[in-house]
Curated annotation (Swiss-Prot):
Name of the encoding gene: hisE
Stated name of the protein: Phosphoribosyl-ATP pyrophosphatase
UniProt source species: Paracoccus denitrificans (strain Pd 1222)
Catalytic activity: 1-(5-phospho-beta-D-ribosyl)-ATP + H2O = 1-(5-phospho-beta-D-ribosyl)-5'-AMP + diphosphate + H(+)
Source species, domain of life: Bacteria
Localization of this protein: Cytoplasm
């Protein structure tokens, strides 16, 4: 978590983690997670495509809305595979200060 005041993404990630054991009948997040990682990944992909469409169309408000949906579904997909937002942040920290070209080359 980043600092004493968690960001909106951290609060959302914490809520998603808390919903992992919730009743799928009362929680949309629990319902998604109960369907398994593959379904969570599918939903993330659908939302990402919707965000892409709005980016191409140029509708700022709709893009913001779809981006929020995409981030939510990314966090759900990560939670389905027991990957935390902190895990992703650690990877970003590891990459910081390296050029994208250099970083991509190091993965080959």
């Amino acid at each position: 978590m980043s600092g004493p005041h968690p960001t909106g993404l951290h609060r959302l990630a914490e809520t998603i983690a808390a919903r992992k054991g919730a009743d799928p009948e009362t929680s949309w997040t629990a319902k998604l997670l109960a369907k398994g990682p593959e379904k969570c990944a599918e939903k993330f992909g659908e939302e990402a495509v919707e965000a892409i469409i709005e980016a191409v169309k140029g509708d700022r408000a709709k893009l913001i809305s779809e981006a929020a949906d995409t981030l939510y579904h990314l966090l759900v997909m990560l939670a389905a595979r027991d990957v935390t937002l902190s895990d992703v942040e650690n990877e970003l920290d590891r990459r910081e200060g390296r050029s994208g070209i250099e970083e991509k080359a190091s993965r080959k």
